[in-house]
UniProtKB/Swiss-Prot annotation:
The lineage of its organism: Bacteria, Pseudomonadati, Pseudomonadota, Betaproteobacteria, Burkholderiales. One of its GO terms (biological process) is arginyl-tRNA aminoacylation. Belongs to the class-II aminoacyl-tRNA synthetase family. It is found in: Cytoplasm. The keyword Aminoacyl-tRNA synthetase applies. Keywords: Aminoacyl-tRNA synthetase, ATP-binding, Cytoplasm, Ligase, Nucleotide-binding, Protein biosynthesis. Disulfide bonds: none annotated. It catalyses: tRNA(Gly) + glycine + ATP = glycyl-tRNA(Gly) + AMP + diphosphate. This is Glycine--tRNA ligase beta subunit. It comes from Ralstonia pickettii (strain 12J).
């Protein structure tokens, strides 16, 4: 297969957009050529992206696309000809336009085919479309790809000839190479060739790409450029780990991506800062190194910050002392600022900052952060009472939860809200669980994040999420489609995870009603607890499916809308065990049948009257239900849901016999009502743990 190379050499591209630009450039060219038939079956594309270039290498490119036999609809027959059967004006006009499009002088009406078009008879023109030539097809694909790139911000620059050009950054060279042959295309006033530039400092002069397949290796050997985005990123990761030695690299993927987008020939150097800075909370130091300097912090085996850090340079040298000293010099003022913020913040207790939250607007329809804190205290206090947590500590934790929003450190680094509250609360002598609640009430911050570790933190976290969910929903800002500006989906999932995973003996209704009561007197807030409850159960379904439970298993439990979720996993495991029994399928089908029968009845169903049980089958079923009831109820009371459901397996024979030999909807109303009562009793027993009808195929 032939290899096609396209490279666009530019000034330094925006680091945070480089990965997206590289992917879009490669995919756009591939799709554009594929749509024109210029790629063979099995063709593949490899994208390249560095700070100064976007490139794509496509294997399986064709010089010419195959010809295609096309059949194009012209007009319905009813309007194509006049009364005498001659071509009418619409047909003449259409054929003239079509001839121009196809590239022929004239299309005779006699050359058209007749055939159905699904509605009526129509005229069709059959012709051979010549396959696109690579140069033309590539020009089209390149122009479309450039136009569709996800450019964060366009800049205007001027070519040497005075032409104004708009692109993400000035473009300097263009390569278009099929194997070793230059394909003539253009972009931004540049004509394609086979010449590029290597590293801005480590490579001298132009580099000729002799063959498209050798692009990456030529750039690496001659130009000191690792062109592959992924390859360069993994090289950085490996070098960081190697240089760190026994220490652990604090290496968030976002930082790794950003640094990768800043270098073409990455080299890692170790640096140091004064140990005195370690008196500042390590989260502050790590964040300032990452955010302001793009450095990688190091921690020891216990997770404590070291006074060493790693930098990724774009310069390889045998004498890196100047690079190391320069980076050590610029980080000191940043660390000194963090230390200053920390020392200044400690001078004012968190509790003294709380009244100033009246200056911070939470939402113009709901009020200030101070008003919100008052609601959090009310909610947290009631939740603590219900859950047996320390009410005073919960109220204190809620009072201080948002106070660090007014500190200098959080003003500089908003990501540290909560974290700094814990440090400052401990400095102020607050109980440890109260201090921890300042940070833990934000947990879980994202999917898979840890839950609060303390009872106080859990209660305040629940209060925070419930207040947000009920309040924001209550002013009409519930999630819609892809929009969820207040992260209500995340808050809902956090509530569910705490109820399930802690677990907490708290009903959904109680939690929502406590939160709703805190908004009494705020006219703008109209809590819609029914809609929020539906929303929570929908999120619950997704959470449980992500845990590996099947749709049927989840529906069997969630369709009953259990109020307490502390036993939901046990119910699901019981459903799974029941579904594996040989009797499960028949009982699930029978339960579904019973559900449908009971739905259709419009009479009040009372208790079973044994004297009215006339048939042997119904007497046997009643006896089976009476025998199973105490076992099921006892197992349910113990939380042994598996035993409760497995006990139902013993009913299978009696249920089958009943439906085979007993007419439920008998003409005798007394018999009918008694049989409905028997089915209702059976239905209640079968659905005590879960709605097993949901297991029916």
């Amino acid at each position: 297969m032939s290899t096609l190379l396209i490279e666009l050499l530019t000034e330094e591209l925006p680091p945070k957009a480089l990965a997206r630009l590289g992917e879009a450039f490669a995919r756009g060219l591939f799709d554009g050529l594929s749509a024109q038939g210029l790629l063979e079956e099995g063709a593949a594309v490899e994208g390249f992206a560095t700070p100064r270039r976007l490139a794509a290498s496509i294997t399986g490119a064709r010089r010419t696309a195959p010809d295609r036999e096309l059949r194009e609809k012209v007009l319905p027959v009813t309007i194509a000809f006049d009364a005498e059967g001659k071509p009418a004006a619409p047909l003449v006009k259409k054929l003239a336009a079509l001839a121009k499009t196809v590239g022929v002088e004239v299309i005779a009406a006699e050359s058209l085919e007749r055939g159905p078009d699904g509605k009526a008879e129509a005229l069709f023109y059959r012709y051979t479309a010549r396959g696109a030539v690579l140069a033309d097809g590539l020009q089209t694909a390149l122009s479309q790809t450039i136009a569709n790139l996800p450019i964060p911000k366009v800049m205007t620059y001027q070519r040497p000839n005075g032409e104004n050009v708009q692109f993400v950054r000035p473009a300097h060279k263009l390569i278009a190479l099929l194997d070793s042959e230059v394909i003539p295309v253009s972009a931004f006033g540049l004509q394609s060739g086979n010449v590029t530039l290597g590293h801005r400092f480590l490579s001298a002069g132009e580099i000729v790409i002799q063959d498209a397949a050798s692009y990456a290796s030529t750039l690496e050997s001659q130009g000191k450029v690792i062109a592959g985005y992924g390859k360069r990123k993994e090289a950085i990761r490996a070098e960081l780990l190697k240089t760190a030695g026994a220490d652990t690299v604090v290496m968030p993927e976002a930082l790794l991506d950003e640094v990768n987008a800043l270098v073409e020939w990455p080299v890692v150097y170790p640096c140091h800062f004064e140990e005195a800075f370690l008196a500042v909370p390590q989260e502050c130091l790590i964040l300032t190194m990452q955010t302001n300097q793009k450095y990688f912090a190091l921690t020891d085996a216990q997770g404590h910050l070291r006074n060493r850090f790693l930098i990724v340079s774009n310069i390889a040298t045998d004498t890196p002392e100047a690079i190391i000293q320069g980076n050590e010099r610029v980080v000191r003022p940043r660390l000194a600022d963090a230390r200053f913020f920390f020392e200044q913040d400690k001078k004012k207790p968190l509790a003294d900052r709380v009244p100033l939250l009246s200056r911070v607007v939470y939402h113009n329809k709901i009020g200030t952060q101070l008003e919100r804190v008052s609601r959090l205290q009310a909610i947290a206090g009631q939740l603590a009472e219900k859950l047996g947590a320390d009410v005073a500590h919960a109220s204190r934790g809620a009072l201080l939860a948002k106070a660090d929003l007014l500190t200098d450190m959080v003003g500089e680094f908003p990501e540290l809200q909560g974290t700094m509250g814990t440090y400052y609360a401990r400095h102020d002598g607050e109980p440890d669980d109260v201090a921890l609640a300042c940070s833990e009430h934000y947990q879980p911050r994202f999917a898979g994040d840890a839950l609060p570790s303390t009872a106080t933190g859990t209660v305040v976290a629940l209060a925070d999420k419930l207040e947000t969910l009920v309040g924001i929903w209550g002013i009409g800002l519930q999630p819609t489609g892809e929009k969820d500006p207040f992260a209500l989906r995340r808050h809902a999932l956090g509530i569910l995870r705490m109820l399930i995973e802690k677990p907490l003996a708290l009903t959904i209704d109680d939690a929502l009603q406590i939160a709703a009561a805190s908004f009494d007197g705020i006219a703008a807030v109209k809590p819609n607890l029914a809609a929020i409850t539906d929303f929570l159960y929908d999120r619950l379904r997704g959470y449980l499916k992500d845990k590996g439970y099947s749709t049927n298993e989840v529906e069997a439990v969630v369709s009953q809308r259990p109020q307490r979720l502390d036993d939901i996993v046990a119910r699901l495991e019981a459903v799974r065990a029941f579904a594996a029994l040989p009797q499960a399928e028949a009982l699930a089908a029978a339960n579904k049948r019973i559900t449908n029968i009971l739905k259709k009845t419009d009479v009040a169903i009372g208790a079973v009257q044994p004297p009215l049980l006339k048939e042997d089958a119904e007497r046997a079923l009643h006896q089976s239900v009476v025998s199973a009831e105490p076992q099921v109820h006892d197992a349910f009371a113990r939380g042994d849901f598996t035993t409760a459901l497995k006990t139902l397996a013993g009913l299978r024979e009696a249920v089958d016999t009943f439906f085979d030999g007993v007419m439920v909807m008998a003409d005798d109303t007394a018999l009918r009502d008694n049989r409905l009562a028997l089915l209702a009793e059976l239905h209640g027993l079968m659905n005590r743990v879960a709605d097993i009808s949901k297991l029916a195929a």
